[in-house]
Curated annotation (Swiss-Prot):
Listed InterPro entries: McjB-like, McjB_C
Primary subcellular site in the record, as a coarse category: cytoplasm
Disulfide bond residue pairs: none
GO cellular component terms, A-Z: cytoplasm
UniProt keyword Hydrolase present: no
Organism placement in taxonomy: Bacteria, Pseudomonadati, Pseudomonadota, Gammaproteobacteria, Enterobacterales
Domain of life: Bacteria
Pfam assignment, any one: Transglut_core3
Primary role: Along with McjC, necessary and sufficient to process the inactive microcin J25 (McjA) precursor into the active peptide.
Protein name: Microcin J25-processing protein McjB
GO terms (BP aspect): antibiotic biosynthetic process
Gene this protein is translated from: mcjB
Cellular compartment(s): Cytoplasm
Keywords of the record: Antibiotic biosynthesis, Cytoplasm, Plasmid
Length: 208
């Protein structure tokens, strides 16, 4: 399993330690991320991270884009869609409890370990199904008694869509000065539960 995920934001290097569920920032090292020899020559203390299995993510397309740090808001349910039955809501809530409890207790490592690797295809006729599953999840998510944040919501949405044979990916983005991390879901390279230009605002440190 990958131990570290790395990316850069402006001049900063950001490291995600999956096992310890923590982020680290190394100022002025970001520009050397893709030049390993130069990076380790100038920052020899980073050799520890490169001796383990690691992944290098993508850099924000426009780090000058303003990004308002604010509390994450749960997506509003789509009132134009048919609401799922109470039984389905109950089953969905149990899944959310399971995902959020494990994320709260076991951290990022559990997400990587439990990630399913099946290859699935996406077609445009699945857009209605995606909208419906987002709406259904939003209806019950406020009842979650465990960790409720963008990571939990996005991971739950990814797993729900995967179970419907949709190749959804959890994406984790970061920025620095001040530090901020955020999670969203993409299908076919498109953001489905957040602003479409998230990759312009944040550097992607992990895709699951």
């Amino acid at each position: 399993m990958i131990r570290y995920c790395l990316t850069s934001y402006r001049e900063d290097l950001v490291i995600l330690d999956i096992i310890n569920d923590s982020f680290s920032i190394v100022p002025d090292a970001g520009s050397l991320l893709k030049e390993r020899d130069k990076l380790l020559k100038e920052f020899p203390q980073l050799s520890y991270f490169f001796d383990s299995e690691y992944h290098i993510g993508s850099v924000s397309r426009n780090s000058d884009t303003s990004f308002l740090e604010e509390r994450w808001f749960l997506p509003e349910p789509d009132k134009t869609l048919y609401k799922c039955s109470l039984f389905k809501r109950f089953i969905l809530l149990l899944k959310v409890f399971y995902y959020s409890w494990n994320i709260e207790k076991k951290g990022m490592a559990w997400i990587f370990i439990s990630n399913k690797k099946e290859n699935r295809l996406y077609s445009l006729n699945e857009e209605h199904l995606i909208r419906k599953e987002i709406s259904n999840l939003s209806i019950i998510f406020h009842l979650n008694i465990f960790k409720s944040d963008c990571l939990t919501y996005s991971y739950a949405l990814k797993r729900i869509l995967n179970s419907r044979n949709i190749d959804a990916h959890l994406v984790i983005g970061v920025r620095t000065q001040p530090f901020y991390s955020h999670s969203w879901v993409e299908v076919g390279g498109q953001v489905i539960n957040d602003a479409p230009n998230m990759r312009d605002k944040l550097s992607v440190i992990a895709e699951i």
